[in-house]
Each structure stands twice: as structure tokens, then as C-alpha cells.
Amino acid sequence: MEAENHTTVAELIILGLTEDPKLCIVFFVIFLGVYIITLVGNISIITLIRISSQLHTPMYLFLSHLAFVDIVFSTSVSVIMLMELLGHGLVLSVATCAAQLCMTVSFGSAECFLLAAMAYDRYVAICSPLLYSTLMSSRVCFLLLGISYVGGFVNGWTFTGCVLSLSFCGPTQINHFFCDFSPLLKVSCSDVSIIGIIPSISSGSIIVVTVFVIAVSYIYILITILKMRSTEGRHKAFSTCTSHLTAVTLFYGTITVIYVMPKSSYSTEQNKVISLFYTVVIPMLNPLIYSLRNRDVKDALRKAIVRVYS
């Protein structure tokens, strides 16, 4: 009934990270640099994997798709955030806001599935090395990739459908730096008792399923490693899993807070900081996490540099 006493609006004002003009300039320079590093790092990973025959394995196939997902995921947020910092806020239509949220959620969810697929790949490689070529055949790899993207887009469409079913009557100022679901609910004049729960169930299901796959995979990996008699074998097995575990911990830790925990457990400013970390910072860190301690990537990079300058 309350919605009937207001005029429905079709535009939303995204306030951004700060309203301080001086801080806007500082943040613009910082996050433009972060975005450029993200693009260069992830494009370099994709290119290196494509041109290096020794990296044509399932693990690096998944890593190249993770890099692609990180590029789109970061771009869907960074471009809008940079425009806000330049213009001290940004006006978007509800449809544009919903489309941006769809991209962010879709590729963020796809990252969850890819991280689970990479954990399964490590499980097969360490626990069943003789069956690796069979269990991780091209058909299986592309099936896992298909599930990752389809599952991601289904979750994205769930969020989008919920947003498009909302009415916005004003005030339409969103205290965030991109169109995220929780801030949109706060400015809606619709009944959000059901709509607010559906995306949490959808995202929560993806997190629970993928975390279960990752946890079970690493439990079996740990058991197998502890049974190894060779110290060198243990070290090699651990080193192949360290980077992935680091990426998993960083990513799942932040998205769990945003999409699963009750919204009353953190403030709007804390929401901004956590969202900034998983949408902007983690996509920049992933290429470093997966390459700095990876001997195969270092060797492939060295050979690529030699080919270029020889």
C-alpha cells in the first residue's frame, strides 16, 4: 500500500565510495591502477597458457577460464566505480543496474564453480594419478566448464529477476559503489520479505555445494599426502595446492559475509570495504597467487621471454 503513495522512479543514483572531491581523485588514481594491473595480469595468464604447450593441461585450462572470469567480474564493477569517482556519483536506469548486477553475480558465481573444479582436478592428480587422463578427459573438463558458466548465469538471472520485480519510489540514492542486491533492497518500496530471501538461498546453495566439493577434495588430498613416504613428493603435492587454497580462502571468506550472513551483522561502510576486496582486489591478486609459487608458470614465462628476444 505504501508504494501507491509514491511516484515510481526508473533511475537510481549510485553515490560511490565517497562524496569528498579530493578523495575521489585519489581513489580514481588508485583503482584505475588496480584495474589496469588486473587486466594485464589476467590477460598475461591467458596468453601464456595458450602459447605454452607445457601448460595445456586441465589445471591450466581451468586457470585460464578463472582469469577470464576475473576480467569480466572486475570490469563489471570497476568501470562503474571509476565513472562514479570521476563524476562524484552516477545515475543509472533500473534496467542498467539490473544488467550490471547480473554480470557481477553470474561471473562471481562462475568463479565459485571453477574453484571447485580446480580442487577436484588437484584431488584426481594427487589421489588417482594413474586414472588422471581418464577422469579429467577433455569431455569432463568442458562439462565442468559448462556447469560453471550455466550455474553462474542461473544465479545471476535469479538476482536480476528479483531486482526487476522491485519498485523504486524514492529516495533513490544507493550508498554503494555498484549495484549490489542488499543496497537495492534498502531503497525499494516493495515488500522485500520474500524477494530478499530468494537470492540468499540461491547464493548460499552454490557456496555450500562448492565448499563441500573443495573440502572433501582437500581432505582426501591431505590423507594421501600424509601417506607419502617421499619428503620431496609431499612438498611438491603441498606446493601445487597452496596457491589454490589461498585463493579459495580469500574469495569464499568475503562472499560468505556479503551474501550469506545476516545484513544486520555489518554496517554499510563495512559492506563497501568487503565488496571492494572481493570485486576489485582479489581479481588483481589471483594472477600473482597462481604464478609466484608455480614452477610450471615460471618456466613457461621464461621460455616465452627467450622466444621473444632470441
UniProtKB/Swiss-Prot annotation:
Signal peptide limits: none
Residue pairs linked by disulfide bridges in the UniProt entry: C97-C189
MF (Gene Ontology): G protein-coupled receptor activity; olfactory receptor activity
Pfam families in the cross-refs: 7tm_4 (PF13853)
Transmembrane segments: 26-46, 55-75, 100-120, 134-154, 197-217, 238-258, 272-292
UniProt cross-references to SUPFAM superfamilies, sorted A to Z: Family A G protein-coupled receptor-like
GO biological process, one term: sensory perception of smell
Keywords, ordered alphabetically: Cell membrane, Disulfide bond, G-protein coupled receptor, Glycoprotein, Membrane, Olfaction, Receptor, Sensory transduction, Transducer, Transmembrane, Transmembrane helix
Entry keyword annotation includes Nucleotidyltransferase: no
Protein's name in the database: Olfactory receptor 5P52
Species of origin: Mus musculus
Source taxonomy: Eukaryota, Metazoa, Chordata, Craniata, Vertebrata
Gene that produces this protein: Or5p52
